[in-house]
Amino acid sequence: MQSWGSRMKRSFFVFILVILIACPLLAPSEDPKTQTSKSKKTVYDYSLVDLDGKEMPLSSFKGKLLLIVNLASQSIYRDQIDALNELQKTYADQGLVVIGIPSADFGGEELKDPAALRKYYRETAHANFQVFACASLRGVNEIPLYRFLTDAKQSLPGGDIHWNFTKFLVDRQGLPLARYEVDEDPADVGFHVTVENALAGKLKKKVQSAKGDEAGGDDDSDDDE
């Protein structure tokens, strides 16, 4: 016959066992939306290499509205660089940061030599916005930032970029907000209004459809080369 002490000890162990089994069942499950928001990537998860070869995390621009553009100094659309300068000058105080990423992927219309690239954007184009090193923006060598920006599941519809001067607006939380193709001129009043609305948090997430597989591509003439 078990003693009173033995029965108490056995009852105590049974009680502990019940608690251990019941606690996970009673604990509130995490909201799936919360789980999604925690795992959702932003541009702040990526970094770029600047014209001097130094890596810069995009988290440096937290809280800013970003306009990310792939540049091409030899393109017939290179006058858009002046328009980007104007946007940076006009809206910097309100929180706009223009980010330019040169690339020779589209028609080979960018300088590949780092010294020539630095000289062009600093001395010829007088870029007043952040210009990074020449990068691959499609194919097997596509940089991680552009894999993210062109992934419809994580970012915006539209797929791989089609030509130079494709523009991505990224909100102050680091989430892609809108995409515009080369034929959307940043010098236009309408584009300035778009930026103003985005700065004010009034622009809804959207995408401008590309007009063909090589939307807005430079013509084949050599007039501007």
Sequence positions of predicted segments:
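N-terminal "domain-start" segment that seeds a small globular fold
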Residues: 30-59, 77-79, 143-144
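N-proximal helix/coil linker or "cap" segments that precede and/or mark the start of modular domains
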Residues: 23-45, 204-214
